[in-house]
A protein has these predicted regions:
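Pair of pore-lining "gating" transmembrane helices in MFS-fold secondary transporters
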Residues: 6-33
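Membrane-interface helix caps of multi-pass secondary transporters
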Residues: 26-45, 127
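Hydrophobic alpha-helical transmembrane and interfacial-helix anchor sites in secondary transporters
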Residues: 37, 71, 157-161
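Central cavity-lining transmembrane alpha-helices of secondary-active solute carriers
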Residues: 52-70
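C-terminal ends and interior cores of transmembrane alpha-helices
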Residues: 86-100
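Cytoplasmic helix-loop-helix junction between adjacent transmembrane helices
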Residues: 107-146
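Glycine-rich segments within core transmembrane alpha-helices of 12-TM secondary carriers
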Residues: 137-163
Length: 167
């Protein structure tokens, strides 16, 4: 293996870490910005309706995990990853227009399509293809460690910003 291919693997792995951390932010923003989003969506005092958005997302995720493996095997994983990232971003923009509750439910089902059906299995397949047989354990370990560290860094940055705003 040449040095270039090792550096190419590292760059690809870093991009996968960033993609995996980023794509799941939109569906789960509701936890971080509970009250402001509830107000913006017109769901103040309707905690059950607000929670139902993530409930629908979770149920759709469970249903779509199995066919996600088939989709990842049937189509090019790089194209699926690009489709997933772009379409999740478009759904986030649509959600930012604060549409009706029915449309919000639809958006969360579509989030499941873009983050699980087309993204999750494809990302696992891409990382699997990135590593040789003897490297796969280390590659997946590095992927998960990188996701954890980058998630920690993002959380610390967010908390620091919130503390600074209160001062």
């Amino acid at each position: 293996m040449t040095q270039k291919s090792k550096s190419s693997k590292v760059v690809t792995l870093i991009l996968m870490i960033l993609a995996m951390n980023t794509i799941y932010m939109l569906p789960y923003l509701m936890y971080t910005y509970y009250t402001p989003l509830q107000e913006a969506m017109g769901l103040i005092g309707r905690d059950a309706d607000y929670g139902r958005l993530l409930n629908v997302y979770g149920i759709a995720n469970v249903i779509l995990y199995l066919p996600g493996g088939w989709v990842a095997d049937k189509f090019d994983c790089k194209k699926l990853l690009i489709f997933s990232m772009v379409s999740t971003g478009v759904l986030g923009i649509w959600e930012a227009t604060f549409p009706s509750y029915t449309i919000l439910l639809l958006i969360h089902v579509l989030f499941a399509v873009t983050t699980v059906l087309t993204f999750w299995s494809s990302s696992v397949k891409c990382v699997n293809m990135l590593a040789d047989d003897g490297e796969q354990g280390g590659m997946f370990g590095s992927l998960e460690a990188g996701r954890g560290v980058s998630g920690l860094v993002l959380t610390v940055m967010q908390q620091t910003q919130q503390i600074a705003q209160k001062l």
